[in-house]
Design a protein with these regions (language model features):
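Short, surface-exposed ligand-recognition loops at beta-strand->loop->(often short) alpha-helix junctions
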Residues: 10-19
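Glycine-rich beta-strand-turn "strand-cap" elements at beta-sheet edges
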Residues: 2, 39-48, 78-109
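Short, well-ordered beta-strand segments in beta-rich or mixed alpha/beta enzyme
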Residues: 2-9, 39-70
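Intrinsically disordered, low-complexity segments enriched in polar/charged residues with Gly/Pro
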Residues: 14-15, 26-31, 42-45
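An amphipathic, aromatic/His-enriched active-site/gating alpha helix that lines ligand/cofactor pockets
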Residues: 20, 24-36, 57-94
Length: 109
């Protein structure tokens, strides 16, 4: 399994607009081979930004990399450059190979 994240430093006062960009767009992810799940995460507020992270889980690094070369990726990111004033600098990518997964025990109902 592979986890891909991008960290964004969102300008104060732009949080709602940043979230709207993400929550209203078509991600084109649902039918991509190897895609498992996506989360948009809001982190701590700092003096000059609020930290956000996009977090996607893939069956493998190869599946993630194939998506980055796909038409679905181009469609999902075609307006990305127009949103730059919402955050500071460039998104910071981090990719992780999953070493261990621990899941909750099934609870009786």
């Amino acid at each position: 399994m592979f986890i891909a994240t991008n960290r964004f430093k969102v300008v104060p006062g732009s949080q709602a607009d940043f979230e709207d960009v993400w929550t209203t767009r078509d991600t084109h992810l649902r039918d991509v081979p190897g895609f498992i799940t996506f989360h948009l995460l809001r982190g701590p507020d700092r003096d000059d930004h609020t930290l956000y992270s996009s977090h996607s889980i893939w069956h493998s690094r190869a599946d993630f990399e194939a998506w980055t070369r796909s038409e679905a990726f181009r469609l999902a990111h075609h307006t990305a450059g127009s949103n730059k004033p919402l955050y500071l600098g460039h998104p910071e990518f981090e990719g992780f190979e999953v070493i261990q997964t621990v899941e909750a025990a099934q609870q009786a109902r």
